[in-house]
Amino acid sequence: MKKGQIAEGNVTTVEFPNKGIVMTDEGERVIVKNTIPGQRVSFAVNKVRKGKAEGRLLETVKKSPRETADTCRHFGQCGGCTYQSLPYEEQLKIKETQVRGMIEQAIGDACAYEFLPIRHSPRVLAYRNKMEFSFGDEYKDGPLALGMHKRGSFYDIVTVEDCRIVDGDFRAILMATLAYFREQEIFFYHRLRHTGYLRHLLVRKAVKTGEILVDLITTTQDWRNVQEQEPDERAKIEAALLEKQGRCPHAGTVNEEKEKQLLAGWKDVLLALSLEGTLKGVLHTKNDSVADVVKNEGTEVLFGQDYFYEELLGLRFQISPFSFFQTNSLGAEVLYSTAREFILGDNPDMLADKTVYDLYSGTGTIAQMLAPVCKKVVGVEIIEEAVEAAKENAALNHLYNCEFLAGDVLKVLDTIEERPDYIVLDPPRDGIHPKALEKIINYGVDHMIYISCKPTSLARDLEVLLARGYVVDKVQCVDMFPNTVHVETVALMSKKK
C-alpha cells in the first residue's frame, strides 16, 4: 500500500491498545485505530514502514453485528469512548482476550498459572468521579466550546452535554459554565497563539458522599501584560487584541477588576444550580504553562473549601482538586479487593508479622488497605504532594503503622533499612525502570503483586521476573473504564522453589 491511498476493509480483531487489524479485499493488512471487530471501514493510509501499513479512520461503512448498545450523541466524534456501541459483555470479552494473549506470549511455557475471568465495573455509565473539560472551539473561530477533544484532534473541542460516563451534576455544571462564559464573551487560551484566558474546567464528585469540587483553570493574561511593553510595541499588541475581538465575539481580555467580577458571577451561577450532590467548593486555579495540561500555579477558594471526602473499602480519604485518586471509585473497590484477595488468599493472618513495601504508592490507598492486616507498610511515591496526602489520610483513618517516603523508587530503596517480606507494585503506565526492577528482584521476597494499567508494560516486566526466578500464579483483569479501551490487570507472583 502507498501513503495517501484510500481503501476499505474489514476489521478482524483489535489489539491493545486500540489497534484495529483491518484486512482489505486484496488481502493486505492495515492497522486502523478506533475500530471494532466486525466493522467494515474506509481509511486513508498515513504510514507505511517495512511493509507494515497504518491508516486513519475515515468512515464506518458498515457497523459490526456486535454493535447493539445505545450511545450518547457524541460517540464517534468525541475522543473519550471507543467501545460504547458494544454491549458491556462484548467490551469485557475484547479486553480479556487482548490481555490474555499478551500474558500467554510473555509467559509461554515457563510456568503454569491461572487466568481468572475479568471482573466488571459496578457501574457501566456515570462511573467517573473526575473530569477535566477543555475550553476551545469546535472549528476555527467558532463559538466557545467546553468538553472533550475531538477524536484524533489536538485542538478541536466537542461540547459533551450528553456525556454518559459522568452523572447529571457534571453535565449541569459544564453547560452552566459554558453558557456563562459565552454570555461574558471571554476567549479561551489558544495553544498556538498563546493568548486567551479560559483553559480547563475540573469537576470532581465523591460517589459515596456526593460532595463536589469545581475548579476553573485560567491563564493570568490581561491588559497588565500589555502595559509593561514599550509604547510602540504596546500599540501593536493593543491593535492586534482589538482586531481579534472584532473577529471573535468571545475574545475579551480580563483585567484584575474584571476577573473578580467574572469569577464572582460564575460562582453565583454554580451555587444557583439544583444538583443531586453537594457543592463543597468552587475554586480558581492559575496556569500559564504552555503545555495543554491541568497544572496548579496557585489556587484561590471562591466558595467553601478546597477538598472533600470519599470513602473506599471502609476507609476515608480527603481529596483536593489535584489529588491522584482512581477515577472510578466503585471500580477501585473491586480492583483493590482483588489485590487483597490475591495477597491474603485463605489466610487473613498471613501478613500479621510482615513488612510490606507498597511501591509507586500514589496517595497510599493500597498501603492503607493492607495496614490493618500487617505489621508495617512502607509506601514509596515520587510525587511529593501525593505522599503528603497519603500521610494525612493514614492519620485520618488512624493507621499508624504506615510510613510514606517521597522520591524515585530506584533511589529510595537504597535508603530503607527494614527489608520487605512482601512487595506490592503499582507502577505508572510505562512500567518499572529496569534498574529499579533489578533491586526489587534482589530482595528475594516470596510473593509479589503487580497491578498494571497497561498490559504491554506488565507483559514486558513479567518476562524479566520469570527470567530471574519468579513464577506467575494467577492473573485477573479488572475493568475500571467501561466504554473505553483501557483495563487494569492484577498478577500474583511467587519465588520459584
Give the location of each predicted region.
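Nucleotide donor/acceptor-binding cores
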Residues: 129, 210-212, 353-354
